[in-house]
Amino acid sequence: DDQLVDALFTAAAVGGVIATRASISGAEGGCQAECGSASAMAAAAVCELAGAPAQAAVDAAAFALMASMGLVCDPVRGLVEVPCVYRNVSGVANALTAADLALSGIACPLDADDVIDAMKTVGDAMPASLRETGEGGCAACRVRIE
């Protein structure tokens, strides 16, 4: 139980840093801020569960954010269903892959704080149509299956 609690605290700490330095809101930073942040939090938690050093958890979080960089928030019909569900599934795979990289001893070449700051810069540069407005990206596609 203590190990799980520690992993949850690790995830919360990563999420707190991202929320402070950037955003965890799709309306502010696109899906990179939502799914990317969640993926980074999960990657760090997996490293904590594996008993890895703290730097591995930080590296895993940075790997996950780098892989999510630029992901837009474009909910079809304004509902958190399509493409959101699929992106969350991809976020799980991303988190596990990022954790595997860090757990195998691969160090992230970029500073995690810098990656978070880059995510904010990218989110700030996104047009409003790609930040949870339901106007651009997949939200602008025709719905084929009801």
Segments predicted by a language model, with ranges:
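Phosphate/pyrophosphate-binding betaalpha-module
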Residues: D1-G70
